[in-house]
Design a protein with these regions (language model features):
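ATP-binding N-terminal substructure of ATP-dependent carboxylate-amine bond-forming enzymes
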Residues: 1-107
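Short, charged, surface-exposed secondary-structure boundary motifs
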Residues: 48, 64-67, 115-119, 164-165, ...
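Active-site nucleotide/adenylate-binding loops and adjacent lid/helix of ATP-dependent enzymes
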Residues: 111-193, 203-206, 232, 236
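Protein kinase-like catalytic core scaffold
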Residues: 152, 206-209, 263-268
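ATP-dependent carboxylate/phosphate-activation module, predominantly the ATP-grasp catalytic core
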Residues: 187-247, 251, 258, 270-296
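Peripheral (often C-terminal) accessory segments that flank ATP-dependent C-N-forming ligase machineries
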Residues: 259, 290-325
Length: 325
C-alpha cells in the first residue's frame, strides 16, 4: 500500500459525516489518488451522501457480513477498512487476517484488547491488575452485605454509548435498577471533570499524540460540546494506560475523570475513532493523515503535541433532504 493511491472503506458509517469529510480533505491536501467508501445497514445513513460510493450491508451480527465486505474490497480495490462501532470490533479483529490475505489492512487492535474493552468487567480487571486508578466495582456479596455508600452508578457490563448508565441515590432505586438493567455492574459514583482522550498509535505500539478533551455536554453518550485541554497529567496517565494495553492499533479513545484533588481515574476504553474526534482533528492533531501514513508503512518515531489547547466544539444538527421512491 505505497505511493499516493489508497481506497478506504468505513464500515457502520452511520452519522460520522465530519470524519468522512476530514479524510477526504487529507486526500486532497496530500494528493492521495483514491476514494472513500462507506458501508452501513441503511441506505439512509447520512455518510452515504458524502462518500464516493455507499454499500448497504447486512447487520454486523448476521451471517454473510464478512463475505459482503470481502466482495466490496475485491470489487473496489480497498486498501484499508476502518470500523466505527463497538459491536463489530471483535468480529473485525477475528477476521483481520482474512482481509490481509487479499491485501486489505483493517484498522483494529488485537482480539485481546477488544475483549477487554467490550466487557466492562474485563475493563475494570485490566485497570486494577495494572494499578490504574478506576472506580471501585462492588461484588454481589458486597451488595448483599450492603458494603457501599450512595450515590452509586449502575450500568450493563456489556453496554455502549452510555445506554443504561444510571446514578443510584437510595436503596429503593438500587433494588429497581438491579432488576431493570440486565447484566448489571454496580460501582462507586465518581464526580469531577470528565475527559475523553484521543490517542494515535501505530502498528508497533508507538504513540503519535494524545489529546484530552473536556466533556462539557453530551447527548446519547456522545460529546456535543467539548474543549481540548493540554493537561499533561492526563496525557501522562493516558500514556500509562496505552503502554499496558495488548497491541493497541490506530485511534484509541479513553475516558477518565479528574477529581477535585487532581486524581485521574479511568472508566472506559474504546479502540476506535470516537464521536468527538473531529474536535481533536480541528485542533491540529491530524488523525486522518497519520492513519494513512501508518498504513503506508510509516513508523511513529517522534510524538506530536503541536495541537491547539482550549479549542471548543459546539455541535449542532444538519439535515439532508431527498426523495425516496
Amino acid at each position: 500500500m505505497g505511493g499516493n493511491k489508497m481506497n478506504i472503506l468505513f464500515t457502520s458509517s452511520g452519522r460520522r459525516v465530519t470524519l468522512i469529510k476530514k479524510f477526504k480533505e487529507v486526500f486532497e491536501q496530500v494528493g492521495i489518488k483514491g476514494k472513500i467508501f462507506t458501508a452501513d445497514l441503511k441506505e439512509t445513513a447520512p455518510t452515504s451522501y458524502f462518500s464516493d460510493k455507499h454499500f448497504i450491508v447486512p447487520r454486523v451480527n448476521e451471517e454473510g457480513y464478512i463475505n459482503e465486505l470481502l466482495k466490496i474490497c475485491r470489487s473496489e480495490m480497498i486498501n484499508l477498512i476502518i470500523p466505527l462501532i463497538d459491536t463489530e470490533l471483535i468480529l473485525m479483529a477475528n477476521n483481520s487476517e482474512v482481509f490481509e490475505g487479499i491485501g486489505v489492512k483493517v484498522l483494529v487492535s488485537s482480539m485481546e484488547l477488544n475483549k477487554i474493552a467490550n466487557n466492562k468487567k474485563y475493563t475494570y480487571n485490566f485497570f486494577v491488575s495494572n494499578n490504574i486508578p478506576t472506580p471501585r466495582v462492588y461484588s454481589d456479596e458486597e451488595i448483599e452485605r450492603k458494603e457501599y455508600q450512595f450515590p452509586l452508578l449502575i450500568k450493563p457490563y456489556d453496554g455502549s454509548s452510555s445506554k443504561g448508565v444510571t446514578k443510584i441515590m437510595n436503596e429503593k432505586e438500587l433494588e429497581f435498577f438491579k432488576e431493570y438493567i440486565s447484566n448489571a455492574m454496580i460501582q462507586e459514583y465518581v464526580s469531577g471533570e470528565e475527559y475523553t482522550i484521543d490517542v494515535m498509535v501505530d502498528f508497533y505500539g508507538n504513540i503519535k499524540t494524545i489529546v484530552p478533551r473536556l466533556r462539557i455536554e453530551t447527548r446519547a453518550g456522545e460529546v456535543s460540546k467539548g474543549v481540548t485541554k493540554k493537561d499533561f497529567d492526563i496525557i501522562q496517565a493516558a500514556e500509562t494506560v496505552i503502554k499496558a494495553l495488548p497491541n493497541p492499533i490506530g485511534c484509541i479513545t479513553l475516558q477518565c475523570f479528574k477529581k477535585e484533588d487532581g486524581q485521574i481515574t479511568f472508566i472506559e476504553i474504546n479502540p476506535r475513532f470516537g464521536g468527538g474526534i473531529p474536535l481533536s482533528i480541528e485542533a491540529g492533531a491530524n488523525f486522518p493523515l497519520w492513519t494513512i501514513k501508518m498504513c503506508q508503512g510509516e513508523v511513529f518515531i517522534d510524538k506530536d503535541f503541536n495541537w491547539r489547547g482550549n479549542l471548543t466544539m459546539l455541535r449542532y444538527d444538519e439535515a439532508i433532504f431527498m426523495e425516496i421512491v
